[in-house]
Each structure stands twice: as structure tokens, then as C-alpha cells.
Design a protein with these regions (language model features):
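Primarily short, surface-exposed interaction patches in extracytoplasmic proteins
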Residues: 6-7, 11, 27-41, 45, ...
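N-terminal module-boundary/linker segments of secreted carbohydrate-active enzymes
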Residues: 1-101, 108-115
Length: 200
């Protein structure tokens, strides 16, 4: 079994590549050359520095057609998550495309940012998972869920497990609205514990 002692020696190119492949989404030859010869702690500190890149907000520029919901006609949502003048009357419109926009927004920004926090957020996304397509509910719920994962990515997993039980996307994904006191296997708590914490 590998030692659990902190490895404080400078990394050669092979070990630096190994660390970078696991700690970020991509790296350049210039980054590899600059980090080779540094200790793991120095490299991780460098990867934790936020870039000056400003995150753009998800934007829905499309005018909603009438489709199956006539109340959606001729409404543009634009930056619906952070627009203080946005009217909530079209919130039910285009939730599928909006969830896809949030997912695309997240991926675009993490690739640009490319920090350890982003890689850890992705790890938590694959651990405390919900479904992007209808499984997370409204697009705003999916957006909040990603931000929750990002906030706790370098903090306590126990705290995240507690907080995520109040998250709308997770509650929707695990059918909290369908709890049944007469069927112990059909409730949110059992599903959450089995899937994400203690198992069966």
C-alpha cells in the first residue's frame, strides 16, 4: 500500500504530468515546464489561484414560440438567472434548453478557468449526481446545484451531504415529492443514504 505521508520532494516531469492530469482539465507544455521541479503543495497552490477570467452568465436569447405552452409566446428570457428586471411569468418556458445552457455555461467557464476547484466540482458532480435532462427540475435548480458543489468542493463532504438534502435539484431527482410513509423503500432519505452515503 502506498504511504500516506505527505510527499514533499520536487516532482519530475513524469510525476508532474500525473498530478496535472488529475488536478485540472487541461495543461499546456509551458505549464508543465513551469511546474516541473516544484513540490506537490506548490503546484496545488498554483492551481488553486483563480484566474482573472470573468464568468459569463447563462443567456437564453431565443424568443419562445407558442409550442405546447401558449403562455410562452413572444417572451425572451435573456440572462434569466441574474437579471433584476426579469419577469417570472415565463419561468416554465424552455426549461430543457435552459438546463442545457446552464450545463454548457458551466463547461465553458471551467475549461477557461481550469483550476483545482473546478476539477473537484466535477468529481462531486459525478458523486452526488443528478440528471441534467428533467432529473434536476428547473434550470435555476440545476444552476444552484452546481454552485453548491463548487462552494463545497474544498470543504467538508459531510457538510455537503447535509446541505445537498435541502437542494431543489437533488430533492427533485430523488422524488422527494413522492414520499410514501406506507412504503419505506419509496422515500427520499432511503434513496439518498443508499446512493450517496452508507450504501445498502
Amino acid at each position: 500500500m502506498a504511504s500516506l505521508n505527505v510527499y514533499n520532494l520536487p516532482l519530475d516531469k513524469r510525476l508532474t504530468k500525473h498530478l496535472l492530469r488529475r488536478a485540472c482539465f487541461q495543461y499546456s507544455k509551458a505549464q508543465l515546464d513551469a511546474m516541473t521541479g516544484k513540490t506537490p503543495a506548490e503546484i496545488l497552490t498554483q492551481l488553486n489561484v483563480s484566474k482573472s477570467y470573468a464568468w459569463n452568465w447563462p443567456n437564453d436569447p431565443v424568443t419562445n414560440g407558442s409550442g405546447a405552452n401558449p403562455s410562452c409566446a413572444n417572451k425572451q428570457d435573456g440572462y434569466w438567472l441574474n437579471d433584476t428586471n426579469w419577469q417570472n411569468n415565463s419561468y416554465t418556458c424552455r426549461q430543457g434548453p435552459k438546463r442545457a445552457m446552464v450545463a454548457g455555461w458551466w463547461w465553458y467557464n471551467v475549461i477557461k478557468q481550469n483550476t483545482l476547484i473546478d476539477k473537484l466540482t466535477w468529481f462531486l458532480f459525478t458523486t452526488f449526481t443528478t440528471a441534467k435532462d428533467d432529473g434536476a427540475g428547473k434550470a435555476g435548480h440545476f444552476f444552484d446545484y452546481i454552485n453548491l458543489l463548487q462552494f463545497y468542493s474544498d470543504k467538508s463532504v459531510k457538510d455537503l451531504a447535509r446541505k445537498i438534502t435541502f437542494d431543489n435539484a437533488m430533492l427533485y431527482y430523488l422524488d422527494n415529492g413522492d414520499n410514501n410513509k406506507n412504503s419505506p423503500n419509496e422515500n427520499y432519505a432511503r434513496e439518498f443514504l443508499e446512493l450517496f452515503t452508507i450504501g445498502k
